[in-house]
Amino acid sequence: MSSSCSGLTRVLVAVATALVSSSSPCPQAWGPPGVQYGQPGRPVMLCCPGVSAGTPVSWFRDGDSRLLQGPDSGLGHRLVLAQVDSPDEGTYVCQTLDGVSGGMVTLKLGFPPARPEVSCQAVDYENFSCTWSPGQVSGLPTRYLTSYRKKTLPGAESQRESPSTGPWPCPQDPLEASRCVVHGAEFWSEYRINVTEVNPLGASTCLLDVRLQSILRPDPPQGLRVESVPGYPRRLHASWTYPASWRRQPHFLLKFRLQYRPAQHPAWSTVEPIGLEEVITDTVAGLPHAVRVSARDFLDAGTWSAWSPEAWGTPSTGLLQDEIPDWSQGHGQQLEAVVAQEDSLAPARPSLQPDPRPLDHRDPLEQVAVLASLGIFSCLGLAVGALALGLWLRLRRSGKEGPQKPGLLAPMIPVEKLPGIPNLQRTPENFS
């Protein structure tokens, strides 16, 4: 999300000019009638209402008989204040030459609008909203003009003014001030938000470029429930639902993170469950626990949501229903076994050690596949060992049968080159 804040666009300049009448010799009323506005340290011109332009009038402060400006000033029905300050605020009265009161004007001082601060957030893949706040307190009545358009690719000048790219008005929320909502946005498109602040002394605009995947922040999960697990003094079962504002679709899922802590413990433990429930296995026995959940897009677009309201739960301290003995039989051994089990399930003091009985979530098919793999590797190992043993026995047996026969392993040295053997020449004398 990038921000580019500058002057007014061409469309907003025309609207702001109609609203801001500071360029007129006698500004029109902006807001309540009979009120004019000025900026501290700047000159201000007041016009006497109810008289025609150029009519000489006298000016007084309301409740003060001292003359501020006489009819011979040459300014007609106008009063010019060179540099106004906070003491100059108040009501001014103008009178014609015949002493008839022409009217009253109230002067209020303030400042032109500064560039507003704008931020946007999307709670799903189709809608997003933008909020803003003034850059500075102007002290004057203020209006906001909001619009948006779809950004085009660089060089696509023909599409810049296309009806398919806007601009369109961003409807302001009547129930929540300083907020407008865009419906039916395209997830992979980039939009430019235009927020213009206008008051009697001027206007200022902020342009904000947004992408839905970067401003996505779901609402917190709803319906969080925390329940004990009967027979397990170290476990709690938490469940929740998707936020109502998230349109759950097969391609747009949420992932969750869960935090929990015992009462009077400030540190949170965090896990990332799969699905809409989680069994906590390392709670502190006998203590209530606070649990909260937040959500995020499954592919990590945007940011994590705010935390849901905390829900509380206390681990179970009783036995499983099917483990409760039949007390009518009165067997001593059964009573001793139950007492021993109660001692193991409900220790005298809370234990911080993990539960030694973990949940078995393994799939039976996975167990069969593991056993089959172990069997195959065992057979291969036995076959390789048997083959190696057979080769070793064969080589040992062939070495005991006699001298080594010429073959691949026989030395490749001529007989006449062996040391200690005379070199016999095949001559007639040798044959005789």
From Swiss-Prot:
SUPFAM superfamilies: Fibronectin type III, Immunoglobulin. Residues 151-170 are annotated as: Disordered. Keywords: Disulfide bond, Glycoprotein, Immunoglobulin domain, Membrane, Receptor, Repeat, Signal, Transmembrane, Transmembrane helix. It is a single-pass type I membrane protein. A motif (WSXWS motif) lies at residues 304-308. The chain crosses the membrane at residues 373-393. Expression restricted to testis, lymph node and thymus. Highest level in testis. Glycans are attached at N127, N194. The keyword Transmembrane applies. Residues 24-372 are extracellular. The keyword Secreted does not apply. GO terms for cellular component: membrane. Residues 1-23 form the signal peptide. Disulfide bonds join C48-C94, C120-C130, C170-C180. SMART domains: FN3, IG. PROSITE patterns: FN3, HEMATOPO_REC_L_F3, IG_LIKE. On ligand binding, forms a multimer complex with IL6ST/gp130. Il11ra2 appears to arise through gene duplication of ancestral origin and has been lost in some inbred mouse strains. Receptor for interleukin-11. The receptor systems for IL6, LIF, OSM, CNTF, IL11 and CT1 can utilize IL6ST for initiating signal transmission. The IL11/IL11RA/IL6ST complex may be involved in the control of proliferation and/or differentiation of skeletogenic progenitor or other mesenchymal cells. This is Interleukin-11 receptor subunit alpha-2. It comes from Mus musculus (Mouse).
